[in-house]
Every structure is written in C-alpha cells, then in structure tokens.
Amino acid sequence: MNNRVHQGHFARKRFGQNFLNDQFVIDSIVSAIHPVPGEAVVEIGPGLGALTEPVAARMDHMTVIELDRDLAARLASHPQLKDKLTIHQQDAMKVNFSELSEQAGQPLRVFGNLPYNISTPLMFHLFSYTDAIRDMHFMLQKEVVNRLVAGPNSKAYGRLTVMAQYYCNVIPVLEVPPTAFTPAPKVDSAVVRLIPHVQMPHPVGDVRMLSRITTQAFNQRRKTVRNSLGDLFTSEQLIELGIDPILRAENISVAQYCKLANWLSAQSTPQK
C-alpha cells in the first residue's frame, strides 16, 4: 500500500501534506484549543478533517482555509461538516485575517496542522494580524517550536524567536511523534499555543525597524553585534544602550532588541 495515500487522498509533497491520524493526539489538541460555540474559529489546512470534525462537533459554525482544491471539495460535500463550514479555497499566506475578524465581529481563534514547508513564513504573516487574533494553536516541527520558545544564549534562539515573543506569549503544549501521521514525516512534531499580548511588554514604535535589526543580526549570527550591526550603531552607542558590543545576536534579549529598534527609530525621525 502506498503510504502517501490516506482515506483515498494522495498526500501532495508540494503542499507538505502529512495527515494526523492518532486519536489521542487529536483529542489532546482539541482539548487544548477548547472551542466554545459562538467563537470565531478558523482552521488553516484542515486536510481530511482530523481536527475539523471534533472541533466542528463543538461549534455551530467555523471557517477553514484549504489550498488543495480536492480537499476543499471533500469538505464541501462532507455530510457532517458541509453545513457548518465556510470554506476558503486559497493560500493562507494571502488571507486578510483582519477582514475575517471584522466579518465575525470578534477576534479569531486560529489553529491548524501547518504544512512544515510554509510554517515560518505563515507565522510571520499571522503576526501582522495579531490585533485581530485572540489565540493560535499550531502543529509544527518540534525544531520550530523549540525556536519559538527559546531564550537568549541558545542555538535555537533566532529572529523567529524574537518576533514571535515580541507579538505573543508562546506556550509549548504537546510533543507528537512521526507515527501520529500518514505519511509519517521524518521529524518530530509539537503543538504550540501563541497568545497575542493584550499589552505589549516591550512596545516598539516601528516594527519594521525591529524586523530589520533582527534580520541583519541573525543573518550574521556568528559575528559580534559591533560588526553585524556596525552600520547602524557605533560601539559607544551600543554601550549606552546597555549592550556589550562583543556579544553575538543570540546573546541579546527580546527587550534589548526592542530598545535598539526604538533608539534607531528616534534617530531616523526628523526633529521638529
């Protein structure tokens, strides 16, 4: 039997499809999400409905975003789901989540078993809509979850860490083995909960500046920040901001990156 076929559907590599089939894991994820009728629940990549069915069973209605035309059609004709779902057959990277929230009249609860080949860019896309999102629960590669929850001074700590923790409180929920999927991926997985901050712990005036600094620092993570950020800050300026110039990107906290971004924004703003 072809191990890429599950419930009559051939898993497409280009969509990064791995279908969840472990009932204990499914129940654990649904319990973690804890959907309640009346909430604006949105699933990204419902696939064959492993999570959609138990979540929809608790709901009067939910929205799903599915790129695969065949899977979207299956959901549209599913006897238990078709009357409960609004189906968007499109790329989640192109979805305006603020519009979905406005239509629902409340912040969104977003979840999904994300295709591993797009999980990082998709999270960056979602971070730009955190004002419209109440919380997010995602199945990801365990390595990505480790990066999301990492602290400074570790190899896992990177730009994704800083930006995720700037926008959200990040909480690991559950580790998931490859055997929970068809076809089995070659990596371990994990579920993570991301709750957008109601009040930013480290407010930044211009998030583009934070993105620029973290990109530049972590693209040259083995260099000291005196070198990697040398075109933006002098060593003296770094010291004034409480940062040792011989530190590397991974040694600087989220709060310190936010401080750098705000300082640089202030220098770029014309004085009145």
Curated annotation (Swiss-Prot):
<keyword id="KW-0698">rRNA processing</keyword>
<feature type="binding site">
    <location>
        <position position="91"/>
    </location>
    <ligand>
        <name>S-adenosyl-L-methionine</name>
    </ligand>
</feature>
<keyword id="KW-0949">S-adenosyl-L-methionine</keyword>
<feature type="binding site">
    <location>
        <position position="45"/>
    </location>
    <ligand>
        <name>S-adenosyl-L-methionine</name>
    </ligand>
</feature>
<dbReference type="InterPro" id="IPR023165">
    <property type="entry name" value="rRNA_Ade_diMease-like_C"/>
</dbReference>
<keyword id="KW-0963">Cytoplasm</keyword>
<dbReference type="InterPro" id="IPR029063">
    <property type="entry name" value="SAM-dependent_MTases_sf"/>
</dbReference>
<dbReference type="InterPro" id="IPR020598">
    <property type="entry name" value="rRNA_Ade_methylase_Trfase_N"/>
</dbReference>
<comment type="function">
    <text>Specifically dimethylates two adjacent adenosines (A1518 and A1519) in the loop of a conserved hairpin near the 3'-end of 16S rRNA in the 30S particle. May play a critical role in biogenesis of 30S subunits.</text>
</comment>
<dbReference type="InterPro" id="IPR020596">
    <property type="entry name" value="rRNA_Ade_Mease_Trfase_CS"/>
</dbReference>
<feature type="binding site">
    <location>
        <position position="18"/>
    </location>
    <ligand>
        <name>S-adenosyl-L-methionine</name>
    </ligand>
</feature>
<feature type="binding site">
    <location>
        <position position="113"/>
    </location>
    <ligand>
        <name>S-adenosyl-L-methionine</name>
    </ligand>
</feature>
<dbReference type="GO" id="GO:0003723">
    <property type="term" value="F:RNA binding"/>
</dbReference>
<keyword id="KW-0808">Transferase</keyword>
<feature type="binding site">
    <location>
        <position position="20"/>
    </location>
    <ligand>
        <name>S-adenosyl-L-methionine</name>
    </ligand>
</feature>
<dbReference type="InterPro" id="IPR001737">
    <property type="entry name" value="KsgA/Erm"/>
</dbReference>
<dbReference type="Pfam" id="PF00398">
    <property type="entry name" value="RrnaAD"/>
</dbReference>
<dbReference type="GO" id="GO:0052908">
    <property type="term" value="F:16S rRNA (adenine(1518)-N(6)/adenine(1519)-N(6))-dimethyltransferase activity"/>
</dbReference>
<dbReference type="InterPro" id="IPR011530">
    <property type="entry name" value="rRNA_adenine_dimethylase"/>
</dbReference>
<comment type="similarity">
    <text>Belongs to the class I-like SAM-binding methyltransferase superfamily. rRNA adenine N(6)-methyltransferase family. RsmA subfamily.</text>
</comment>
<protein>
    <recommendedName>
        <fullName>Ribosomal RNA small subunit methyltransferase A</fullName>
        <ecNumber>2.1.1.182</ecNumber>
    </recommendedName>
</protein>
<dbReference type="GO" id="GO:0005829">
    <property type="term" value="C:cytosol"/>
</dbReference>
<feature type="binding site">
    <location>
        <position position="66"/>
    </location>
    <ligand>
        <name>S-adenosyl-L-methionine</name>
    </ligand>
</feature>
<keyword id="KW-0694">RNA-binding</keyword>
<keyword id="KW-0489">Methyltransferase</keyword>
